[in-house]
């Protein structure tokens, strides 16, 4: 006889335990912060810093190994910044775009490659920092601050004339556009990474060995694309704030 207890004990119904929003909280200065996000973020920063120090500790005229990879990544980010911002101003923004790209890229891949679920926490579980909306909103707000700074630094208060160009009645639309940019950046990245991890988790629970492997490879690809999209849009917004409007 099929009883409620039988249904609840069925492994298929364990899929319902896949949930969003469970966190391991730290109390810092009377404020609760997501401890698991900070832990994995520190891991991501350690990987990036460790890679940079190791790859550039013994530079050779003919690069090989990690130095070769480091120079390839640097050239890639320089080209991205040059394309989006323009040849005149791009150099000063390479470090910012490089930091954004590497942090998002390594964060996304850490969620796909590192078995965080094996590390037990009092509550919640470790995951990619970009799996938390607070992280993606923070990155988007940093991008917003960057393109406002870029425009004001180059044009002074004249930067704000763009809101009434080419006609004053466009002011509300232009202001709204600047508010929607960080929203679209943050929710696009958060939604894609969260969806990828949830789908992978469900399929691993259903078919642990075969089906998840190609899906995980696809997840690595989409994670890299999301890092590229985020940094490309950040560069495009900065370039837009720097260009002359006539």
UniProtKB/Swiss-Prot annotation:
<dbReference type="GO" id="GO:0005886">
    <property type="term" value="C:plasma membrane"/>
</dbReference>
<comment type="similarity">
    <text>Belongs to the ATPase A chain family.</text>
</comment>
<dbReference type="InterPro" id="IPR023011">
    <property type="entry name" value="ATP_synth_F0_asu_AS"/>
</dbReference>
<feature type="transmembrane region" description="Helical">
    <location>
        <begin position="99"/>
        <end position="119"/>
    </location>
</feature>
<dbReference type="Pfam" id="PF00119">
    <property type="entry name" value="ATP-synt_A"/>
</dbReference>
<protein>
    <recommendedName>
        <fullName>ATP synthase subunit a, chloroplastic</fullName>
    </recommendedName>
</protein>
<keyword id="KW-0793">Thylakoid</keyword>
<comment type="subunit">
    <text>F-type ATPases have 2 components, CF(1) - the catalytic core - and CF(0) - the membrane proton channel. CF(1) has five subunits: alpha(3), beta(3), gamma(1), delta(1), epsilon(1). CF(0) has four main subunits: a, b, b' and c.</text>
</comment>
<keyword id="KW-0934">Plastid</keyword>
<keyword id="KW-0375">Hydrogen ion transport</keyword>
<feature type="transmembrane region" description="Helical">
    <location>
        <begin position="201"/>
        <end position="221"/>
    </location>
</feature>
<keyword id="KW-0406">Ion transport</keyword>
<feature type="transmembrane region" description="Helical">
    <location>
        <begin position="222"/>
        <end position="242"/>
    </location>
</feature>
<keyword id="KW-0813">Transport</keyword>
<keyword id="KW-0812">Transmembrane</keyword>
<dbReference type="GO" id="GO:0046933">
    <property type="term" value="F:proton-transporting ATP synthase activity, rotational mechanism"/>
</dbReference>
<dbReference type="GO" id="GO:0009535">
    <property type="term" value="C:chloroplast thylakoid membrane"/>
</dbReference>
<keyword id="KW-1133">Transmembrane helix</keyword>
<dbReference type="InterPro" id="IPR045082">
    <property type="entry name" value="ATP_syn_F0_a_bact/chloroplast"/>
</dbReference>
<keyword id="KW-0150">Chloroplast</keyword>
<dbReference type="GO" id="GO:0045259">
    <property type="term" value="C:proton-transporting ATP synthase complex"/>
</dbReference>
<comment type="function">
    <text>Key component of the proton channel; it plays a direct role in the translocation of protons across the membrane.</text>
</comment>
<feature type="transmembrane region" description="Helical">
    <location>
        <begin position="33"/>
        <end position="53"/>
    </location>
</feature>
<keyword id="KW-0138">CF(0)</keyword>
<dbReference type="InterPro" id="IPR035908">
    <property type="entry name" value="F0_ATP_A_sf"/>
</dbReference>
<feature type="transmembrane region" description="Helical">
    <location>
        <begin position="133"/>
        <end position="153"/>
    </location>
</feature>
<dbReference type="InterPro" id="IPR000568">
    <property type="entry name" value="ATP_synth_F0_asu"/>
</dbReference>
<keyword id="KW-0472">Membrane</keyword>
<keyword id="KW-0066">ATP synthesis</keyword>
């Amino acid at each position: 006889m099929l009883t409620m207890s039988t249904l609840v004990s069925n492994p298929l119904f364990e899929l319902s335990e896949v949930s969003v929003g469970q966190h391991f909280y730290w109390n810092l200065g009377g404020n609760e912060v997501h401890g698991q996000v900070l832990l994995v973020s520190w891991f991501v920063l350690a990987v990036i810093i460790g890679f940079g120090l190791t790859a550039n500790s013994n530079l050779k005229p003919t690069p090989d190994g990690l130095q070769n990879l480091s120079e390839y990544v640097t050239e890639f980010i320089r080209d991205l910044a040059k394309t989006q911002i323009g040849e005149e101003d791009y150099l000063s923004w390479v470090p910012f775009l490089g930091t954004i790209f590497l942090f998002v890229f390594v964060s996304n891949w850490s969620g796909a490659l590192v078995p965080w679920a094996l590390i037990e926490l009092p509550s919640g579980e470790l995951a990619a920092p970009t799996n938390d909306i607070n992280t993606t909103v923070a990155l988007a707000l940093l991008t917003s601050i960057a393109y406002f700074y870029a425009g004001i630094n180059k044009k002074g208060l004249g930067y704000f004339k763009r809101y009434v160009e080419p006609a004053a009645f466009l002011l509300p639309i232009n202001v709204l556009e600047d508010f929607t940019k960080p929203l679209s950046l943050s929710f696009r990245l958060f939604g894609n990474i969260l969806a990828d991890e949830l789908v992978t988790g469900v399929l691993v629970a259903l078919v642990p060995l075969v089906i998840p492997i190609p899906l995980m490879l696809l997840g690595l690809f989409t994670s890299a694309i999301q890092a590229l999209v985020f940094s490309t849009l950040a560069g495009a917004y900065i370039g837009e704030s720097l260009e002359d409007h006539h």
